[in-house]
Amino acid sequence: MRYAIAVDIGGTFTDLVAYDHDARQVVYSKSPTTYDNFADAIFHCFEKAALTPAEARFLNHGTTLVINALLQRKGARTALVTTKGFRDILEIARGNRPDPFDLHYSRSEPLIPRELRFEVSERMAADGTIVTALDTNELERLAQRLTEEGIESVGIFFMNSYANPAHEEAAARCLQQLMPGAYVTHSTSLTRQWYEYERTSTVAANAYVGPGVDAYIRRLETDLGTGGFGGPLLMMGSNGGLLSVERTCEQPIALVESGPIGGCIGAGAYAEALGLKNVIAFDMGGTTAKCALVEEGRFSVESTYYVGGYTKGFPIQSPVIDIVEVGAGGGSIAWADAQGRLHVGPQSAGSTPGPVCYGRGGDKPTVTDANLVLGRLNPDNFLGGDLTLDVEGARQAIGDLGERLGYHGAEGPLQMAEGILAISTVIMGGAIKQVSVEHGLDPRDFALFCYGGGGPLHGVSLARELSIPLVIIPPEPGNFSAIGMLLADARIDRSETFTGLLDTETIARSRTVFEAMEAEAREALARDFGAQDVLLERHAEMRYRGQRHNIKVPIGRAGDVASIAAAFHRDYKRRYGHADAQAAIELQALHLAAFARQQRPDLACLPRQPDLESKVQERRVHFGGHGTVTARIFRRDALPEGFSDTGPALIEEYGSTTLVWPGDRFEIGTLREIRIHLAGH
């Protein structure tokens, strides 16, 4: 068992990275994602890398299984068991209209339909005292009915259970005994915060995806074991940490953004190694583009995440790195509406059939086809030559779309391709503004850190759109999310509802609660990972008294009222543009993050070995207002540390191509990263 291995299942490709800590060697592979059985793509990656599962010491795994099941409504047949009188909480929700200007607004249907939501007699008071005892006889009759209904999974939510989970825990034990083949989960095993709609939504989502995730992981463990794998399988959590299989099967909702998070962790590690305090992590894959901020070396982790977006989605109370995702990937389809307006995405051609240029039956033009028509992709060296791209097929598809929109003649396909990329740039720029400008931050104060198969190709265009002066392309950007998973630590988050005005007495009470959460987290990390050395971070959700929305503020172990208040005022002003130093501040919740360090690869060993024999070539490439010019083509593994040149240029490697615009200067850094300095910035 030589290798530490990470596998990332993306919307279009599945990536594998294997690192030998002793020999300090690395192996990469990539294979199209297989939607019928995700595990097939994992084993295809093993074959391409000439490795077997028996050579793996451990395997870190990120997957889009959970988010796909939620968005595509492909989960289990699920029932909700709740307190009498609260059957319709999923439909009542918050009773608000998130987008008041959308005249056709409609909220998404609940994951669990009304006929599968059931009430039982029980009630807790807000302080945790029992008002009405749990009727176990009623539960027994309900279990019989659920079995007859063919229910595969049950979510349990009782009012005020965050204050006293006894009834939920008793109901879960009862249903597990009476329905041994069903998946049973309850809200207080996932979150101990108030807000009844959010907790109900969380447990409903967890129950909905639970059977599928459990079956997938157990089958993958079995298949890996058959191949000789004897190490632990660890899952990439949405909080930026690794989770054990047991914890994942109990809390599969913790994987809701499992796939993209690995790249965020990798971006943070590289930013620290390169001495960059502030970077925007930008991941453009085949299906979507994602972005997140690293500010002062840290990611922001949100305690509530909206599946499908705030406007039409639904919330889950689970820690997720603050990441924004838009439907603008390499496979995003370009199309025209009835009014003759051009759109890009969110529909994607995926890996099957894929873009037109893949030659697998796709007939709708995509972002990848547009890049190929403009000369920005090498048709003979895509994925290292594993796939030859059909230039004429892409040109025909884009030309046909252009004809419908009035772009005729020989220049029509070029103009149409430029339009497709311009729209995708605006969409991706909007995502970056959402994580920066909407939080009171200026993207010009950050470096743009680009990875994914399409990130390096679009990074400079995006930086120009936002006036960002520096673009960083890490080694192996096409496999970078998997690299990030090898750089992740184990992490467990705990949270508690905690209310009170910010004063000395409240701070003293909070320390007692934090100490209890810390003891619980230490025990969990020791049990799951054998960890003895644990790092701890404390945060509090706070607001001005009388307000509705909270902000999350870091607080030190020795924090006093003055220092905590100062931190709150500072963060509040940055977020909203003002602060009131005289207003009373109140706490609403406490959050704890506990980390156990894992062995990491040496970043200097991650680039492939240089091939200094490669020769520089040339190709005609279209660069917007610069027209079609001759660009030099470099092989990335032929560029040594310190190499520098000026665009127009393309830097090709397995799985990705970096585009350098005319006049921009690029150089190879100490970790073999590409640094692109935009002209005029």
Regions found by a protein language model. Give the residues of each.
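Glycine-rich beta-strand-to-loop/alpha-helix junction loops that act as flexible
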Residues: 63, 157-159, 187-189, 238-239, ...
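N-terminal glycine/serine-rich phosphate-binding loop of ATP-dependent small-molecule kinases
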Residues: 1-79, 125, 132-155, 168-187, ...
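Glycine-rich phosphate-binding loop of actin/hexokinase-like ATP-binding domains
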Residues: 28-34, 79-85, 105-108, 245, ...
